[in-house]
């Protein structure tokens, strides 16, 4: 096993202190003493049951809420209230995304046609190519925690990081710019990777999936053209107020939540390569989060560890499944910090992580994020130092 990690020894004069420290210290990169089958066996049977009616009830709930908010905002049309509308509607757009995400996993129902139709409607409405994103997200789940093969917010190897222009590094690691990256990711993927979620011939997809990608790109295009048509009818400002700004809020939710589920824990968590990676070890690097009042609105997306290991579990069973699995996971499960009504504490975790988690070593089968000490030292400051 090759580990790229600082090793610190305790030298305080107490001959027994080192042993006690070793016993107390938990190594999150150590092989877990359980198998994924042990976790599966601990999850109650009802957690695996998918109800199309229950899933559709959440769709109806969210669509009614989105429509009601839009109608109310247009009717009142007050610049004092528009910011409240943007925040609320953008949050609901994110909730709609989560339901479409469930369709992509097949946790929405056991009916593939229903999953595909509902998924296309929901994701196209918020300008997400359903099959394109579904397939790349499947790759993310199948390779979670793998430095090279993971797909979402994958860490950059040092050699790739060092080749990026300083301006690109600043864009990637200066808040809030990374929280606006999703549309670019759909078009170009992440640094070090190539392909588009819209192109049927992208390296993201197998030849057998090209028709699916073409279908989703067509649905996306219909929505995009519809927005342009609406801007001619009602004016660009009206479309921007009703749809455009909430879309930006949705993108920020998506990027922030996705990032926080794989970064920003108080202790450094491992990323794997080669023989050290396994589906279980990669999944155990994910992090649960408490989003306060948004937990229910966002369909319990914060219960992320069990979701990553068993994406076929419906979102409305994830809380029960997580509670049941904790005794098996032990210290490999990191209890999320309890949130107030608004999860302000997560902003601190997000900013701190972006400022220090920049790249991983080019070598080693178990690696941890490292910090570029010169990233925020601008050219003028560097010249003074030199």
Swiss-Prot record:
Broad enzyme group: oxidoreductase
Residues covered by region (Disordered): 1-30
Protein known as: Acyl-lipid omega-3 desaturase (cytochrome b5), endoplasmic reticulum
InterPro entries linked to this entry: FA_desaturase_dom, FAS_N, Fatty_acid_desaturase
EC number assigned by the record: 1.14.19.25
Family, per entry: Belongs to the fatty acid desaturase type 1 family.
A Pfam family recorded for this sequence: FA_desaturase
Catalysed reactions, as listed in the record: a (9Z,12Z)-octadecadienoyl-containing glycerolipid + 2 Fe(II)-[cytochrome b5] + O2 + 2 H(+) = (9Z,12Z,15Z)-octadecatrienoyl-containing glycerolipid + 2 Fe(III)-[cytochrome b5] + 2 H2O
GO terms of biological process kind: unsaturated fatty acid biosynthetic process
Spans traversing the lipid bilayer: 63-83, 220-240, 242-262
Motif, Histidine box-3: chain positions: 304-308
Motif Histidine box-2: where in chain: 137-141
Superkingdom in the source lineage: Eukaryota
Motif Histidine box-1 per UniProt: ranges: 101-105
Membrane topology reported for the UniProt record: Multi-pass membrane protein
Pathway(s) served: Lipid metabolism; polyunsaturated fatty acid biosynthesis
Cellular location(s): Endoplasmic reticulum membrane
Biological source species: Arabidopsis thaliana
Tissue: Abundant in leaves and seedlings. Barely detectable in root tissue.
Location (main, coarse): endoplasmic reticulum
Domain comment (free text): The histidine box domains may contain the active site and/or be involved in metal ion binding.
Function according to Swiss-Prot or TrEMBL: Microsomal (ER) omega-3 fatty acid desaturase introduces the third double bond in the biosynthesis of 18:3 fatty acids, important constituents of plant membranes. It is thought to use cytochrome b5 as an electron donor and to act on fatty acids esterified to phosphatidylcholine and, possibly, other phospholipids.
This protein's UniProt keywords: Endoplasmic reticulum, Fatty acid biosynthesis, Fatty acid metabolism, Lipid biosynthesis, Lipid metabolism, Membrane, Oxidoreductase, Transmembrane, Transmembrane helix
GO molecular function, one term: omega-3 fatty acid desaturase activity
Biased composition (Basic and acidic residues): 17-27
